[in-house]
Swiss-Prot record:
The gene is CYP73A33. It is a single-pass membrane protein. Belongs to the cytochrome P450 family. Its EC number is 1.14.14.91. The keyword Signal does not apply. It comes from Sorghum bicolor (Sorghum). The keyword Isomerase does not apply. This is Trans-cinnamate 4-monooxygenase. Keywords: Heme, Iron, Membrane, Metal-binding, Monooxygenase, Oxidoreductase, Transmembrane, Transmembrane helix. One of its GO terms (cellular component) is membrane. Its main location: membrane. Pathway: Phenylpropanoid metabolism; trans-4-coumarate biosynthesis; trans-4-coumarate from trans-cinnamate: step 1/1.
Amino acid sequence: MDLVLLEKALLGLFAAAVLAVAVAKLTGKRYRLPPGPAGAPVVGNWLQVGDDLNHRNLMSLAKRFGDIFLLRMGVRNLVVVSTPELAKEVLHTQGVEFGSRTRNVVFDIFTGKGQDMVFTVYGDHWRKMRRIMTVPFFTNKVVAQNRVGWEEEARLVVEDVRKDPRAAAEGVVIRRRLQLMMYNDMFRIMFDTRFESEQDPLFNKLKALNAERSRLSQSFEYNYGDFIPVLRPFLRGYLNRCHDLKTRRMKVFEDNFVQERKKVMAQTGEIRCAMDHILEAERKGEINHDNVLYIVENINVAAIETTLWSIEWGIAELVNHPAIQSKLREEMDSVLGAGVPVTEPDLERLPYLQAIVKETLRLRMAIPLLVPHMNLNDGKLAGYDIPAESKILVNAWFLANDPKRWVRPDEFRPERFLEEEKTVEAHGNDFRFVPFGVGRRSCPGIILALPIIGITLGRLVQNFQLLPPPGQDKIDTTEKPGQFSNQIAKHATIVCKPLEA
């Protein structure tokens, strides 16, 4: 470490602490802030609570400090809400006031300081991007046009697993094949293209670039430079890696996909996929070319991996609950007929399959804190003052796993959505269960995720008995929480024993 730089940073910290205290006493606005642990000057609560602000740690803090509490993370205020009533206030009632997204040094790089849709502030740019993305990505028409492709990709997964001699014996890490399926599901929508196999060089390049992007943005390593700007020089190497990765990813998107669609459109004049719609919006001057690339960035980050995590969690729970797996198979055989593959239109006739999807999203929520919200101006919440540009976290996982609000929430029990919770849906009609958020900044990808998860789990259970590897009673479902995610820590080996056709 550069000792001169460290000395300057420490002196800067001391000076900032003295100045902050003096300014606060002389001119500071008096706020009635939410409760929370007392913090130290400059660093606030950072050294007390550490970097790992995952959903379970925040649940523990809520039990100590209440339904709404404040953490001071350096110069940033972080407000956490943990009840359905407060979630409704943030996401719906005051959806405009708390409808922006927080900014940090890493996401500013990956989104061009908010030129995308998912991570931009609430305003005209967000409204424009949401409108432009909705028609080609997030409508019932899109589902109707693409569902045959999703069903085909699920069929190919089943075929490939059947062909693999390891699958029925020692088992396979089925996630790897499902990852190819998810890329194909989304790249069919985006670019009217697909990858032929897991060995496809372009697929592997994309997969590696997206994985590195997730690692860099999900890591807690950069928090100190984000929380305490005077320490940001120590992040120089980290931020340079982010810039380099962004450049390489954007070049792959541009050279291999966007330009290819431009060539096809020039030849045919037809609009066949989402990117054609997006490029038409660029041609009309509604967005610029950077916006086009950031839309591709959003879909790669916000649609592919998150849905894959949910499928992986669903498989893990079905393996560990063979009676539930058998009950699902019986439902499909009874409703569809033995050997009849489940399709997207069938899902509404399969309530137990729908309940399994919802129970997976409840217990193993992929984005347990949702995407953080922010208020651009001073606001009020539960009678407390919320200073402008506070980061607002809704602990959606805790809302869906609070024993005060759910019967035996730590159990994987799909029957709850057919019995005491039969009116609860994933789109947020009950603020105890908001896996995709609610309101203006909710995730529009719900319209794609639910059928893809349902088709995939249904096809696998129709064709295989899903089992743990030899010598194991269950597979490990330890969580690996990130800043914005909840993944399974170890990608499990699954024995896929073919069923009689």
